[in-house]
Amino acid sequence: ENAIKAGAHKITIPLSVSETHSQANLRKTHAQVLEEVVKIVDLIKTLPENERPHFEGGLSTAFGCTLEGHVPQAKVVEMAEKLVELGCSEVGLADTTGYANPLQVKNMVNAVWAAVGREKLKGIHLHNTRGQGLANVMAALDIGLDTLDSSLGGLGGCPFAPGASGNIVTEDLVFLLDSMGLKTGINLDKLMSVRDIVTAALPDEQMYGFTPDASLPKGYVQTLNGGTGWGTGN
């Protein structure tokens, strides 16, 4: 309700595919979370169509769970179908624990697309716990996803996913995309300046990122209208 009053253009509700994680993280079963989905959908429907926020069902622990271990692909698909059936505008896949690998990303996306349609899954939320974050980004891009979650300095994590680090690092992600000539609209120099602000404000938080540590390559000039072409063979 507060998000809608504030004019949020997008709202995401997390649904852990691992019910053990759901009960630990949200203190709710799948059934209880789905009840919340119905309430939010009903609330959104009371608004004029041009004022309705986009409502995403985020499928947490879609690639594995530190509490349950393996999460079956069929269970992820089942939960995606339920969220769409109840009225979510789209679903998103989240590698909460950093278990995913590139082949798994492609297979999972294809399975969910087959169930709910490509228009209902456009984004993915990745962690770099085991060093596969950007490799998974490449798999997601290759298959056609265009919404990639990340966080400045890789901040974040989940208290109920022991050992999981934060999201993929925004600074590294933007450099990766820009160096391949993909437009992000994000100024790398200004992004690095923001990192300095956060580092000063949170001196006890570990900040991650290879690009900030190594700095941009010598002679690298960003062009915000679509990258530099580095790494494209030019």
Regions found by a protein language model. Name each.
Residues 1-234:
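Catalytic cores and adjacent flexible loops of soluble metabolic enzymes
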